[in-house]
């Protein structure tokens, strides 16, 4: 079956999903979560095959962490589906209502986007998260995962599709692309008369490929080169907490810290404490000359290091003379994802927030909160670094659009 045929079937199924009531979608998502739990053994066995193949190819630790499933992670995925089920349904929500002087009643109403193509790499959880969010928002979804997770994705998709069929919803509403050839993905990205939106999640190469070749509208989940700036007024203990949580808890996450910027006025006191805490957690440090003057045993940081999304236990460090230099560094090397300042200076905090255009800006809070669930959206489909209708963590509302509904009693314009 061609990718165009699959997309057409998904579009037809999306029409069915768009008509489901909020209670029906709630019940459907609960059933999808139960299906994952029922198929847990098969899903974990499939994941073990993917992990074995990935290790044989010498896949790095960050990618292996993203790929891996266990009982706890699978239970978390099922729980996330149930959380999405309980979220308020955005479809049909009236966001504006007005009666014009001529008597017509004008409403802006949220409606589903239609068909969403999700293109991602070694993250089996995205298969379930994307399906849940798209269906809750009344859409069909085409899932094109990476070859690294093909067995895991297939097992998850089969379980979710069974729940759809049992609810009398066409299982094409959740279409998994099993033909992973690049030319098939290219064809999918050309189907702008069928597919309404493409969302790539993965490495920089994948996202650039999708953005450069798509005729379908694209919202990019670009790399997360996230910074922590420790201002001269920062409380040491608070800044250390933000640093450790942001770098060492899950370095493979896109909201983990990659670069530490430290005000020169606090560097001699803060950097030794930071280095000790990070080394205890096996973090490799790389710094500029000013950092090496305080920490002489660390490697030099290159220009490429400051632009890198390591997704690993590696941190680039730079000492800066002031806030303006920190802001200039972030503008040059950042990816518009998430930036953090540790400060007790309210004016500097406000300048930091107002001067950066990143999707998420934090003041005295960990970069790891840059997540749909933590920010109150429920599960997220990605973190948009594209300034379109959605910017930052994308929850349910980002998978809908507003349209006008006008009601009258025969009014004409002329």
From Swiss-Prot:
GO cellular component: cytoplasm
GO molecular function: glutamate-5-semialdehyde dehydrogenase activity; NADP binding
CDD domains documented for this protein: ALDH_F18-19_ProA-GPR
UniProt xrefs under Pfam families: Aldedh
Location in the cell: Cytoplasm
Enzyme Commission code: 1.2.1.41
Domain of life: Bacteria
GO term, biological process aspect, one: L-proline biosynthetic process
Transmembrane residue ranges: none
Catalytic activity: L-glutamate 5-semialdehyde + phosphate + NADP(+) = L-glutamyl 5-phosphate + NADPH + H(+)
The entry's keywords: Amino-acid biosynthesis, Cytoplasm, NADP, Oxidoreductase, Proline biosynthesis
Pathway per the UniProt entry: Amino-acid biosynthesis; L-proline biosynthesis; L-glutamate 5-semialdehyde from L-glutamate: step 2/2
Top enzyme class: oxidoreductase
Chief location category: cytoplasm
NCBIfam families in alphabetical order: PRK00197.1, proA
Family that this chain belongs to: Belongs to the gamma-glutamyl phosphate reductase family.
Function: Catalyzes the NADPH-dependent reduction of L-glutamate 5-phosphate into L-glutamate 5-semialdehyde and phosphate. The product spontaneously undergoes cyclization to form 1-pyrroline-5-carboxylate.
Protein name: Gamma-glutamyl phosphate reductase
Organism field: Xanthomonas euvesicatoria pv. vesicatoria (strain 85-10) (Xanthomonas campestris pv. vesicatoria)
Gene that encodes it: proA
